[in-house]
Amino acid sequence: MSLELKEKESELPFDEQIINDKWRSKYTPIDAYFKFHRQTVENLESFWESVAKELEWFKPWDKVLDASNPPFYKWFVGGRLNLSYLAVDRHVKTWRKNKLAIEWEGEPVDENGYPTDRRKLTYYDLYREVNRVAYMLKQNFGVKKGDKITLYLPMVPELPITMLAAWRIGAITSVVFSGFSADALAERINDSQSRIVITADGFWRRGRVVRLKEVVDAALEKATGVESVIVLPRLGLKDVPMTEGRDYWWNKLMQGIPPNAYIEPEPVESEHPSFILYTSGTTGKPKGIVHDTGGWAVHVYATMKWVFDIRDDDIFWCTADIGWVTGHSYVVLGPLLMGATEVIYEGAPDYPQPDRWWSIIERYGVTIFYTSPTAIRMFMRYGEEWPRKHDLSTLRIIHSVGEPINPEAWRWAYRVLGNEKVAFGSTWWMTETGGIVISHAPGLYLVPMKPGTNGPPLPGFEVDVVDENGNPAPPGVKGYLVIKKPWPGMLHGIWGDPERYIKTYWSRFPGMFYAGDYAIKDKDGYIWVLGRADEVIKVAGHRLGTYELESALISHPAVAESAVVGVPDAIKGEVPIAFVVLKQGVAPSDELRKELREHVRRTIGPIAEPAQIFFVTKLPKTRSGKIMRRLLKAVATGAPLGDVTTLEDETSVEEAKRAYEEIKAEMART
């Protein structure tokens, strides 16, 4: 079946090319880049071997790639290394010993809006703390290579410190996002078979205390096998329930650890698991994605160089929570692997004012900013005056991650945040890939920018867009995103479920990794990811991606944000409905509602016109910034909301319900 774009289904700027003067010397012709790219995928093993040689290995590999048992590929077989050594030890042997590694900022502020909770850690500080925590885990709890540790912590320095300490020993981490419920936490503890859980008493979120230890206690009523719980007193709460013989205060344990404690880094095999990270599926058991050590390190190292062009004087800020894969790769490992200085922030992006993030960029002189399209669209709604209050001139690179970025959001951020002087890209990758796969690469060769595109595949990644039969889709034709050859950071499987690994990723198109995304490759070879193939509305047999509809709505000057879901229809099978957040100063009206429906009709086609448009002041999002479309669909269909523990603001669902009920009542009266 053809997935060709319908007439005006998408007005993506395929032919628009932007070259700014500040980066002009870095630009290369598109054809020249793809000639180089073709050489890297045709000589895959020698290319990735040359990258791997730039890292320090305790023992070199015997074989670059073992492809004898596809799709269970192994990279740098026989090689031994340690992530903690690469991220910390090797830097303290150089001038970077006293360089700042982490600038951490908590959420609380004083009456003038200045943060009251800040910490600075040099690479030597980090080295000492990682060793002390590793010593504590090994001596007090007998943690050894292969043990699983679940971390249920907020965005505090102890989270990356503990991950590095665990990897130092050879333990396997399972970080669970601190917004997950007790049931979700229990499920992940059971599946990973963790015997230790590390958590905190609580943390700050939008000025409120979020209690964590009680969630762990509730989870352990259902989870089995946990022997010990270590509790970090982040807030110093006095009424935290502690179970004798199982629960231990972090600070009391650390009091007994010598300041010069040292644990020898375990030289683990390249294919040794470093972490398990669970993907949040809409149905069924969460998938425990397993990543190795050597391949992941090489992939993250390469992308830090190519995509972020890291220099010694850079201040790097990735806004992702460490509970997600972006935080693993580009908060914990990536910046520290490069010896960079990074910013970590605990709280909400717009608390107590919508300029919190911009004040952070100004305060620390952030040069590289990695964030989500959802966050950018939220700030668009607040208006330009908030970023204009701050000096953002230090920014030289901005990248987005997590979902496709609409061309309008791209242009806004490029102009308002980057002053049209930054290199700006939209990276594509996923939990399963381990690191960035498609992106502009200002640290390597910068091809002309196009608003909203993900750009070309990075060197060493053979990416394509294929049709229903697995054949390459022609330029401009919508298809499925696949990766045709193995890559170093690829997942090593699903924890304890090899059959599901094969079925989920390798059975749809045999011999190719199926990403589950719709995409278009334009005539220049740029990839435009359109969103999940399962985020599709089928109207009278026509497939419509939610991304295309949302992009059409956001392109209207009155709209700040939108979310589109499909609801059952007796005639068409399914029809799209839209929840729309208007820009400040724009009043909702029936006339505007009609105008927006007509705008979508003109932009995409009659088939895409929303059956209803609901005006809301906020959309339900996770704390990582992703729109929770399933909640909007539940509101519209009357279905149970399900688990809402990751919801940032519960009033957003009530807002959607109110808007929906108002329209229903109005329709009943007419």
Swiss-Prot record:
GO terms for molecular function: acetate-CoA ligase activity; AMP binding; ATP binding; metal ion binding. One of its GO terms (biological process) is acetyl-CoA biosynthetic process. The keyword Nucleotide-binding applies. CDD domains: ACS (cd05966). InterPro entries: Ac_CoA_lig, ACAS_N, AMP-bd_C, AMP-bd_C_sf, AMP-binding_CS, AMP-dep_synth/lig_dom, ANL_N_sf. CoA binds at residues 205-208, 326, 601. Keywords: Acetylation, ATP-binding, Ligase, Magnesium, Metal-binding, Nucleotide-binding. Pfam families: ACAS_N, AMP-binding, AMP-binding_C. Belongs to the ATP-dependent AMP-binding enzyme family. HAMAP family: Ac_CoA_synth. This is Acetyl-coenzyme A synthetase.
